[in-house]
């Protein structure tokens, strides 16, 4: 990378607010901000390579990209084929509602209606922790769940960070905010096996960005909450 003075970073363009194509047809989002930050700190030019969930790991394995910054969660299967840096951003399922609604614990959901997408991770987690007095209303897909919350059919919504970030950006009039965490599964940057020098350098950049508050700023800008403590 340093020799070529250029780094190719794989990013999502179909997953707002982490990665999407803006009105100017340029990729933008949290993952794109992170990619630009890394290239800037390495002092090299950047080439963004759009990937999907299916081809992002093959891009690393075949050397088409040096890094994958694409809402990548860490699990044992993936660790067999690629390496990971420290975590750089939160990815989470949570309960969101209007700022004016006082919700500080799951007990506060008593007597309230919560919209959720049937069978999604947040449905499973919510069913586990919600009090019996909460009315959980299930919808067939994320669009239907969001529509129910936006139109006021339900008072709260339980969904993933990306869906919520997108919803809040499109509907500022809702004045919605993050209320309760259901599940945390942070994002890591993927690096090809054997690229230890690059991996350690990126870890240094992540650690510095964390200390400088840059990771928190990025998460607040795109997800509505600070990055907080992320796993190494």
Which residues does each PLM region occupy?
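Ligand-binding clefts/hinges and TM-proximal coupling segments of bilobed small-molecule sensing domains
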Residues: 121-138, 176-178, 207-232
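Ligand-binding cleft/hinge of the Venus flytrap
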Residues: 21-22, 35-44, 122-140, 168-172, ...
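Alpha-to-beta junction loops
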Residues: 7-8, 43-45, 51, 62-70, ...
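Acidic, polar ligand-binding/catalytic clefts
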Residues: 36, 40, 45-108, 173-182
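Extended ligand-binding regions for polar small-molecule ligands
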Residues: 32-41, 103, 107, 112-113, ...
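Short helix-initiation/N-cap motifs at beta->coil->alpha
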Residues: 32, 47-58, 137-151, 183-185
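Periplasmic-binding protein-like
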Residues: 89-97, 161, 165-207, 225-232
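Immediate post-signal peptide segment of exported/extracytoplasmic ligand-binding proteins
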Residues: 1-26, 102-103, 107-113, 232
């Amino acid at each position: 990378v340093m020799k070529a003075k250029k780094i190719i970073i794989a990013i999502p363009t179909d997953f707002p607010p982490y990665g999407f194509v803006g009105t100017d047809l340029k990729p933008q989002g949290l993952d794109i901000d992170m990619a630009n930050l890394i290239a800037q700190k390495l002092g090299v030019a950047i080439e963004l390579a759009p990937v999907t969930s299916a081809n992002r790991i093959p891009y690393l394995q075949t050397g088409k990209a040096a890094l994958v910054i694409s809402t990548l969660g860490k699990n044992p299967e993936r660790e067999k084929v690629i390496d990971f840096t420290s975590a750089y951003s939160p990815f989470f399922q949570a309960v969101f509602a209007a700022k004016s609604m006082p919700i500080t614990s799951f007990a506060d959901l008593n007597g309230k209606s919560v919209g959720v997408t049937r069978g999604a991770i947040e449905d499973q987690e919510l069913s586990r922790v919600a009090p019996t007095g909460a009315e959980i209303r299930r919808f067939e897909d994320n669009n239907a769940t969001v529509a129910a919350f936006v139109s006021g059919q339900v008072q709260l919504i339980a969904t993933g960070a990306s869906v919520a970030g997108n919803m809040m950006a499109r509907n500022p009039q809702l004045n919605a905010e993050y209320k309760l965490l259901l599940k945390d599964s942070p994002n890591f940057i993927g690096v090809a096996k054997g690229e230890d020098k690059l991996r350690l350098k990126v870890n240094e950049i992540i650690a510095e960005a964390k200390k400088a508050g840059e990771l928190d700023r990025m998460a607040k800008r795109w997800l509505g909450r600070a990055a907080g403590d992320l796993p190494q």
